[in-house]
């Protein structure tokens, strides 16, 4: 595949909205979108620049509970969903062989970064705009495998020693 492929990944909701803050970059590369947001289609003008949109169905199942429900997923079901997500990420990385993976989180970041690293990709993590004084769990897990970390609040520079701050995405 093309060696200029940049993969942009984000879970539905706020992570996806923040990822769309990078829309000016999408058309500058052969870009692939990885998401669980089924509303992300080529019908949306800002997404027409993507070479492909890859959906992670396992990412949806990995969520502990659905919005408004207090019922939690069993640990076995959560691990099974996460292993399926890792397999999906492996297949996506193998298919596209991205040079760079950029994510705003959440669920997809860890398996996608691990698979991307094995395939030789550089990784960029953008910490959530919702976090001002504390790292996200995703940030904690990907901090040491990220080639670059960007934070959206200057206060976060104290928590991430190698991070860079350029302001908020949205």
Where are these regions (language model features)?
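Conserved nucleotide-sugar phosphate-binding/catalytic loop shared by glycosyltransferases and other
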Residues: 7-12, 30-81, 155, 166-169
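Active-site-proximal region of nucleotide-activated glycan assembly enzymes
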Residues: 121-170
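Conserved hydrophobic helix-helix packing surfaces used for dimerization/oligomerization
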Residues: 4-6, 101
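Glycosyltransferases and closely related glycan-assembly transferases
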Residues: 90-100, 110-124, 140-144
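Short amphipathic alpha-helix
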Residues: 15-27
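Residues at the starts of beta-strands that form the adenosine-phosphate
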Residues: 5, 30-33, 122, 147-148
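Short His-centered aromatic/hydrophobic patch
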Residues: 104-108
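An amphipathic, basic-hydrophobic alpha-helix
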Residues: 74-99
